């Protein structure tokens, strides 16, 4: 049976993660390991609810059921998230390999950020004679950003260059913040530093674009360097001078560490993999031939990708629609299964959507009462397939992650993310992937669009529930809480259809009128009169427990009797009259409002003489007035 390895990472760092997993994929022994990659897409631009919901993906796995854990530190920008992950890993009691984050008891594999950044800065100072340096940093708490900062400081000090806090801006890894800072801080190109040193390639590319859009500068007019050696940095013009962190080699080292552990041996506790400075056009060097080759390769790939882009978009749109158009939880499940189990697909051979049981209760509970940031132990398998074989299980335990998984065959990589509306967790989904495809946006696109569809679905469901409640209130008598005249008119139309189709062959109508309501109101007040009506209604409802009761007038009620109430109608009506007599005989035990007097009349449907239900109602009404007249003669109170 294959080993299960949990990989905890941030989805926005997909390219570095992809390179790392490519090293793992290449060097893992065949049919030896499956990798469950739990991806959070939390960023500094998210509100707190969304950040916490994204981070909950690391709580989905029961880590002690895995054989090892890999914490992919780059991109884990929130210290509280890092602390939580490390705590969960410690509690699991299994081997932990930490990439880029040192922690007691964990095997550490790191990229030598310092060495690569030092090479880059030395190059800018020595070859390009840069003396005024500016660092667009990540976040203050991020180790990688701070190690790169130390390399800049050390290089500046060695060359006698002033570099202080005013030469650092913390972007929180957000390009927008970097752009705003540069626009407000530098009024003209004359104020620019000799080089913008950026904590990653994305910040570097954004800075380069800003130079052209805002300051109308050509690439040769400003020097910009990045870090990471992302695909975009190679094909961008100018290609970025940057640092390759050699994540492929780090992935290879991680596999070597795992193999050593599983062989019962002790691997090295700490390994540093050298980074590599990569010269590009953005620093002023001439390497256009290599960059042009990269761009041609990219263009060819884009032409191929564009052929499938509309197909993928159409598939995701269909999935969105399947969720949004569902008017109930069961309808959504059916819609998704119909879509996913039929026809061709763009989501790959392995794909699962799991629903949290809370989705069944969305319409039943008020929104404030729904559990927040909460995971269930069991999840419903809405749709699932592994290697194009449909899942047969309806539920999956969280400890298994994937249902019906024999854990045999080729090594697999599963990408896993939460589905949520703000801090309401709706479930999780899984997409099988190759290491190379992790850098593509398919997984994040599916996740974003499903989350968005859930927003519309849940809001629609809540609105439908609210409308139903309002409709129910419109059909409910406010005093007695039985159905009112509006509901009665609606009900008898539907009931008449059942009679016509033969679905309802036997029934009776019981008509009731409360006696002496005016006497109670005049003698004891209207509050007592209201209580008198409620007590009368309760006696009717308690008598005919299995039949609908309607208040059709101020002191008039009607019930349509069928099934057991129809069969036992005479005995039930007699018991109601007996109860009224018992209360009258024991006046000292009851309040005046409880000693009720109700005239009643009953009529049974006769298909030979009754053309419709109103004919039966009218007969019951006549019988009721006949009894009312008799009761008045008998001086009922």
Question: Whereabouts are the PLM-identified features?
Answer:
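Catalytic core regions of nucleotide second-messenger enzymes
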Residues: 266-271, 503, 550-553, 580-600, ...
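Short regulatory/linker helices and ligand/cofactor-binding micro-motifs at input modules
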Residues: 306-338
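A short, aliphatic-rich beta-strand micro-motif
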Residues: 403-420
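Conserved long alpha-helical elements within nucleotide-processing catalytic cores of c-di-GMP signaling
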Residues: 484-508, 515-542, 550-554, 558-559, ...
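Catalytic-core segments of nucleotide cyclases and related cyclic-nucleotide turnover enzymes
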Residues: 526, 569-577, 588-591, 603-637
